[in-house]
Amino acid sequence: MSQQDDHQQLVVFTLGAEHYALPIQAVNEIIRYSEPRSVASRTDWVRGVISLRGRIVPVYDVAARLGLRSELTEQSKIVIVEAGSETAGVIVDTV
């Protein structure tokens, strides 16, 4: 195993005052925040959906799910992540 194999590249982002990271392989892209179109949901952390190049992508407010205080600002982004055949957007404060 080479020394390079020991390092994993991460995308680091903030939710409230906390820092989190995702493996770069899981991140498809990072886009500027725009208000998702609302959908009927029983939870406050499902924010809605966006259209991304013809695909409907659900958007989640993970900060709300974790009970963290977070505000939308001009620096807010939506991180588009993929897991298997599923794609979703996650609202983050900064990247």
Language-model features and meaning:
Residues M1-V95:
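An acidic, low-aromatic, low-complexity terminal/linker signal
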